[in-house]
Amino acid sequence: MNPYAQLFSRLDAVNQGAFVPFVMLGDPTPELSLAIVDALVAGGADALELGIPFSDPVADGPTIQGAALRAFESHTTPDDCFELLGRIRAKYPQLPIGLLVYANLVYVRHIDGFYEKCQQAGVDSVLVADVPVQMCAPYKAAADKFGIDSIFIAPPNGDAETLKQVAELGSGYTYLVSRAGVTGAETKAGMPVDGLINTLREFNAPPALLGFGISEPAQVREAIAAGAAGAISGSAVVKIIETHHQNPEHMLTRLKEFVEGMKAATNR
């Protein structure tokens, strides 16, 4: 059983959904980003979704773009990120770890080389944000070769054929987007999504985690009530880092408290 299947099975047994925070590796510095991961896990994060800083993040709003800029300012490179991933994996051997990246980051290392590096660092899944499921073949082949789950986005306006492909080609979990546009806590998730979740279920898709605009516990409760296996929150987490990174101790406390509140909302 892969790490995500184990996670969902364990959570189902105690009637909980998953809460998965997203942060950018290297934000605000490589060492502080390790402390941030510790705070997220201490707060109850069920899995991690992590970014590698990229200069043109087309799916991201200003908050996560700012995280990438801070990571660049601290001279964080992709190699640094893989080193951080290895350290996170060594510390948390059972925690599902996913990467959310852009195609250029994968391509510049050659697709096989990138996924091999992910395997060596202990990464469980990769979502390539700017590669739609219809164009995923070389990425999916490399992921399968190195035992990495391929995560695909189920768009809110996706037709049945797209959702069927997401279901058939994806593994680990399905990233269900609650609204069109870019990431950002400023624009709330657009409910309801129960119709999309039901369609994905009919196609035997991996469990759906709802993302984009998830910033408060009520939205986590709504996502789980609609049938999602959990929720992903990125911009709201990164906003705490943006606001408080000059005071690391306070920032880490706020991050832990935020995750505790979001995780508490996953009780079914």
From Swiss-Prot:
The keyword Transcription does not apply. Keywords: Amino-acid biosynthesis, Aromatic amino acid biosynthesis, Lyase, Tryptophan biosynthesis. The active site is at residues 49, 60. It is an enzyme of class 4 (lyase). InterPro entries: Aldolase_TIM, RibuloseP-bd_barrel, Trp_synthase_alpha_AS, Trp_synthase_suA. The keyword Lyase applies. Pfam families: Trp_syntA (PF00290). GO terms for molecular function: tryptophan synthase activity. Pathway: Amino-acid biosynthesis; L-tryptophan biosynthesis; L-tryptophan from chorismate: step 5/5. The alpha subunit is responsible for the aldol cleavage of indoleglycerol phosphate to indole and glyceraldehyde 3-phosphate. Belongs to the TrpA family. This is Tryptophan synthase alpha chain. It comes from Aeromonas salmonicida (strain A449). The lineage of its organism: Bacteria, Pseudomonadati, Pseudomonadota, Gammaproteobacteria, Aeromonadales.
